[in-house]
From Swiss-Prot:
PTM text: Methylated by PrmC. Methylation increases the termination efficiency of RF1.
Name of the molecule in the record: Peptide chain release factor 1
N5-methylglutamine: residues bearing it: 237
Source organism, top-level taxon: Bacteria
Localisation: Cytoplasm
GO molecular function list: translation release factor activity, codon specific
Family classification: Belongs to the prokaryotic/mitochondrial release factor family.
Keywords assigned: Cytoplasm, Methylation, Protein biosynthesis
Cellular component aspect of the GO annotation: cytoplasm
InterPro entries listed in its UniProt record: PCRF (IPR005139), Pep_chain_release_fac_I (IPR000352), Pep_chain_release_fac_I_sf (IPR045853), Prokaryotic/Mito_RF (IPR050057), RF-1 (IPR004373)
SMART domains, sorted: PCRF (SM00937)
Primary role: Peptide chain release factor 1 directs the termination of translation in response to the peptide chain termination codons UAG and UAA.
PANTHER family referenced in this protein's UniProt entry, alphabetically: LD18447P
C-alpha cells in the first residue's frame, strides 16, 4: 500500500478512535446534539476503519509469520508460508476496497429522492413514454424494497403524463437514482402509426435529493403565491370534489410546483413545499458544484440536447450513452435496471480514483 493512502487511512482511524473516547465523556454523553454529531461522523467512517483494522491485523500476521521462516521445523515453515500467502491475498482485496471507501462521498447519497418526469419532444408519444418510465421506476422500487409515492401529475389526453413527480423512499435512494437525470430517448412504433414507421420521442428526467430539514432551505412566506384547485387521479378520473390540490409559485425564482395526491389541502401544501425546497436545494448544489468545478459528468443536466439513454423497442435494446452500456429493453422496463446503475457507479468510482491519484 502506498504511503499516501496508508497515512490517510491511519488519520481516519485515529479520528474514529478519538471520537469513541469522546462519546464516553459525561459532557458529551449528556449533550444530545454533540453526541449525535460525533456518532454520525463515526458512522460515516466506520466501514473504512473496520476494513483498515483487518488490513493491519493481516500486516502483523505477515510480520510474525516471516520470523517463523527461519525455523528448522518444515511443518512450521510451511504453516508460516501459508499464513503469509493467505494474508497477502486478503490485503490485496482489502486495499482495493479501501481505495473506493476512502473516496469523497456525495453529501446527499443517504437521502430519499424526488424525481420529475416530463414529456418533451414527440408530443403524445413522449407523454406515453413518461408513464412507461414511471412504471419502470415503480417496479424498480418494489424490487429494491423501496417505496414510491406519487406527489403530482398532469394527465395527458392520449395517455401517460405530460408531467409526473414522485418520491422514492429507501436506503440510499438518491445515491442509486441520481444518474437517471437527463434526457431519455425512445424509439418505437406508436400505436397510432398506420405505416409501421419508428418514431423518436424524448422525456426529461430531473432527480433531486429530498430536503427533510426545514433549516436547510429557508423560504420567506412573502415569496410564495399559493393557489388551490380540484385534484384528479392518474388517468384523468376525478378523485376529489373539493379544492384540495395545491400549487405554489416561488416568486423570486419563478419555480412552480404542485401536489394533488394527498387527501387534504394541508397535506398537499406540505408535499408541494417539500418539492419546492428540493428544487431550490438542487439548484444550489448545481451552482456550488459548477463554481468549484465538481459538476458530475455522469449526472445529466436535463438539457434537451443531452440524451443520456436510448430505449430502442424494435431492437429490444436500452443503451446508456455515457458509458456505452447496453442491455435488454424488455428486462429493463420490468424495473431490472440495477446492472445499469451499478455500471454508472463503477464509472463514477473510476473517475474519483483518477482525480484523487489513488
Amino acid at each position: 500500500m502506498e504511503d499516501t493512502l496508508y497515512k490517510s487511512l491511519k488519520s481516519i482511524k485515529e479520528k474514529y478512535d478519538s471520537n469513541e473516547k469522546k462519546l464516553l465523556l459525561p459532557e458529551v454523553f449528556n449533550n444530545i446534539k454533540e453526541y449525535t454529531k460525533i456518532s454520525k461522523e463515526n458512522n460515516s467512517i466506520s466501514e473504512i476503519v473496520e476494513n483498515f483494522n483487518k488490513f493491519l491485523i493481516n500486516e502483523q500476521t505477515i510480520k510474525d509469520a516471516k520470523i517463523l521462516l527461519d525455523e528448522k521445523d518444515e511443518e512450521m515453515v510451511s504453516f508460516a508460508k501459508n499464513e503469509i500467502h493467505k494474508s497477502e491475498l486478503e490485503n490485496q482485496e482489502l486495499e482495493k476496497k479501501l481505495r473506493i471507501l476512502i473516496l469523497p462521498k456525495d453529501e446527499n447519497d443517504e437521502r430519499n429522492v424526488i424525481i420529475e418526469i416530463r414529456g418533451a419532444a414527440g408530443g403524445d408519444e413522449a407523454n406515453i413514454f413518461a408513464g412507461d418510465l414511471l412504471k419502470m421506476y415503480n417496479k424498480w422500487a418494489d424490487i429494491n424494497k423501496m417505496k414510491l409515492k406519487l406527489l403530482d401529475y398532469a394527465n395527458a389526453s392520449s395517455g401517460g403524463f405530460s408531467q409526473v413527480t414522485f418520491l422514492v423512499e429507501g436506503d440510499k435512494a438518491y445515491s442509486k437514482l441520481k444518474f437517471e437525470s437527463g434526457v431519455h430517448r425512445v424509439q418505437r412504433i406508436p400505436v397510432t402509426e398506420t405505416q409501421g414507421r419508428v418514431h423518436t420521442s424524448t422525456t426529461t428526467v430531473t432527480v433531486m435529493p429530498e430536503v427533510d430539514d426545514v433549516a436547510e432551505v429557508e423560504i420567506n412566506p412573502v415569496d410564495l403565491k399559493i393557489d388551490t384547485f380540484r385534484s384528479s387521479g392518474p388517468g384523468g378520473q376525478s378523485v376529489n370534489t373539493t379544492d384540495s390540490a395545491v400549487r405554489i409559485t416561488h416568486l423570486p425564482s419563478g419555480i412552480v410546483v404542485s401536489s394533488q395526491d394527498e387527501k387534504s389541502q394541508i397535506s398537499n401544501r406540505e408535499s408541494a413545499l417539500k418539492i419546492l425546497k428540493s428544487k431550490l436545494y438542487d439548484l444550489e448544489i448545481k451552482k456550488r458544484n459548477e463554481e468549484t468545478g465538481k459538476f458530475r459528468k455522469l449526472a445529466g443536466s436535463g438539457a434537451r440536447s443531452e440524451k443520456i439513454r436510448t430505449y430502442n423497442y424494435p431492437q429490444d435494446r436500452i443503451t446508456d450513452h455515457r458509458i456505452g452500456f447496453s442491455t435488454s429493453l424488455k428486462i429493463a422496463m420490468e424495473g431490472k435496471i440495477n446492472n445499469i446503475i451499478e455500471a454508472l457507479h463503477a464509472e463514477e468510482q473510476a473517475e474519483k480514483i483518477k482525480e484523487a491519484n489513488l
